[in-house]
Amino acid sequence: MKLSAWSKRLLAGVCTAALLAGGASALALSPAALPAPEAISVTNASDAQLRAALSKLAVVYSSDTHGWQVSSPYEDASLSSASCGLYPYLFLSQDDATVSLTLGMSCFSTQKMELQSIRVETKDSTYNFTCDDQYDGGYDADLKSWFDFEFFAMDDHAEYLTEWAAAKSVTATFTGKDGSTKAYTLTKDNLQAIRDIMAAYTTLLDSDAS
């Protein structure tokens, strides 16, 4: 989804200010890729909203992909404890000022499980995801667990994540190609991560020079 040039400058300004102040968690930016602080002194309400949204997230700049990846620290905690999870993240391109919303789904199990499909359920709705043929998993000796990852572009289905964030309970059922299944109820931290990412996503898309 396209961002205005103003929104792009605003994001860069927020990241630069956080870098100088040491305020954003897990912040790793390339200063050379960002404008000088004097050039991005935007101090309106949208600036404050974006600063607040990003302060809860990890913002990492990649010189390889020429952009920023925005993710939740809750995801790192989940992965390090071998917990299943449904965690969205954002990618903000430096080259064409676009923001992309992606959902990463991770499944950990005691036996190898190559995912075929994932069903997500709330009290009122069911959402079905079909996995690709590529196996992105393996065995983690440190965690003593098998895992598989699936990634889905969500720009056209952002409302799914908004609905999950508002639900009292969300359950994901992972189904393997061998017919095995594993159920996972999203934790409080997982739901909060979705809320935090969606708040940043909405703020970025709603930002304008007015």
Residue ranges and their predicted role:
Residues G13, S25-S210:
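A generic "folded-domain core" signal
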Residues K8-S25:
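Sec-dependent N-terminal signal peptides
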